[in-house]
């Protein structure tokens, strides 16, 4: 068989019963390396076909045929190939019954992907064989596009190593004294618009004396911090660094992002991802979502919502909805919180929705990536 394949003497064709779960339309083609892929779709699936990600990743020629239960058998007879594999993931019970009968009669191969078992199954002549599942490694953008969304290109500031230290300093100070930090950040945020546009921030000397213990612990945030010309003067290293102070959620998002990146376990990791729900061009009125941290691994989307303070059950529902929308049934919804809520009902709700909840104790120990990987083994 292998020698014949090398000399192209056998034509291998994959027939894919189209599935609303787009990832499943891609896996069999990746697994089998066929010479032709034929997608069979129903009338109500027309809006799903010709997915750009699928067509870019499948190297074999592709064809599309619309079917109904009445026409399915005759369509199968028209398909060419010495070895015909039929992926039954997308068919309803009637379609699978028709395909199974045709497979027995014509000695077709029936195949399907076992995502939970990490196996690819092939049924032929009454026997079942298994292969290790080959799932294409996709970027965050590819997975989002696969499920109909589009990532918006935003001018995001990815801090360098110096900026990372600044973010870590801000988060550490907030963790030491959240109330003091809140008052400090509020004072910075209340500055006039002219100060917000510059790196230099000035206030009465009282501000410096009130918050000197915080300021001295932020050496990477400020290039200068002290009394000058009778006033308190703070010189931010960069305008973007002001956000690290005024919005504590930002340093916590970066902390989560860096934990994921540092693990080197994921195919792709991105930060503060803005997504157009319908794959459009972000025109006014288009539904969109911002995901705090997003990663991908073996074709699965990990959607992480970051909460630096208290959260409610709505936050759990929201991260679940976003993960399902942009990553399908294999997505991994995660809520990372820099607080231990000690609310058993929240834990129960997260478990009910299959949302991984990672709170302050684990985040401070930098266990986010480890816990996500362990979760993915059983979910």
Protein language model regions, located:
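Short beta->alpha junction loops
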Residues: 16-17, 59-72, 307-310, 361-362
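A broadly used, surface-exposed interaction patch
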Residues: 34-108, 112
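Short beta->alpha connector loops
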Residues: 18-23, 43-44, 90-93, 310-311, ...
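Structural motif
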Residues: 12-13, 36, 83-85, 300-302
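A short acidic, amphipathic alpha-helical/loop segment
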Residues: 24-31, 51-52, 74-75, 98-102, ...
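N-terminal beta-strand-loop-alpha-helix module at the start
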Residues: 3-52
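Mixed-charge intrinsically disordered linker/loop segments at interdomain junctions
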Residues: 97-99, 104-170
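Intrinsically disordered, low-complexity Ser/Thr/Pro/Gly-rich regulatory segments
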Residues: 23, 142-379
